[in-house]
Amino acid sequence: MKDLTAIKGVGEFFAKKLSQAGYQSITNVTDVHAKRLQADTGIPLLIAARIIKEAQSLIAEADSEKYVVGVDMGGTKILAATIAEDGTIVSRAKTATKAHKDPAKVIDRIADCINTAIEKAGLEKNSIQAVGIGAPGPLDPQDGVIIFAPNLNWYNVPLKKELENRLNIPTFLDNDVNVGTVGEFTHGAGQGVNSLVGIFVGTGIGGGIILNGKLFHGTNKTAGEIGHIIVKADGPKCNCGNSGCLEAMSSRIAITKRIRRAILKRGKKSHILELNDGNLDSIRSGTLAKAVAAGDKVTIKVMRRTAKYLGIGVASVVNFLNPEMIILGGGVVEALDDKFIERIRKFAVAYALPNTMDGVEIATAKLGDDAGVIGASVLARQHLVTTY
């Protein structure tokens, strides 16, 4: 116990315990506190005084930190993370969305997940400056209302207001792909550039746009619907009602449909059946990667076609925006190898105007699932500056 390193370790333990036990004025160290700790624990007075001082230092340091909670809300899971000012993730929490429940119960689950992240960080709720959330579907970031989230079957849900009522913490909302793009821009693949477009390929396809260092929302807050660029006029019907959208050609749902059709209607043999336990209704990105690695001809052909149309989509974005960087992310991109990215690049160059791709970097996302929570925390801090 005479080792100062040991004293520091004990101080870390006691920093929270002391305040919980009633040492409210812990930052004003006195002999009274040391004597009380001695009486409570039986340790020597000198050691008690050192522990109190170490706890004081730790509490003061924690008080000076400015924490926010970033949340990535999806149709299947909710991720929450307590994040320090420098972007360091201090704690994480995860729970199932249970989207079949009514909005009030799902919002309760979001609030519980946030509280769990705060508790895991060893912080009190009043240490959290704000909560930032990335949510699916068209939404109004100013009022914090989800206009329509098809995966949740939500219409006009005032998520910001409902969470602030439950948490008593300022809460800010933006589109999930926007916050993922911001995360990559500030702490991931996009660091050091001034303009970029994030294209995220998963169940659907979404995009986020950074221009002159700022997130671009558009006039009615719907900028970035890259999944609905038309890349094949006579292509399959998209959920939006149009035909030949990028999402209808290259999303995971589109990939699944094409593989299923090849196997069931054309009688093609594929390892996918074995790898996915015979299920052709939903094929996960990891399974696609395994099939490609195994040399599965059906999957490889479909993924080559997928890359082609993603390349055409990238070319369209570069033609009209010409950003410094295109960041490709999402489950489908993250699961596949560099050959997939190179094929996207090949078709982007082929379909872009001459020289338009010069100097435009096509990069892959670096942050994975953390992009959403980090981006949400960044936007929350920005809103704090402009709102309060």
List where the protein language model places each region.
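ATP-binding/phosphotransfer module of carbohydrate and carboxylate kinases, centering on a glycine-rich
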Residues: D63-A130, D140-D143, K161-T171, G183-V193, ...
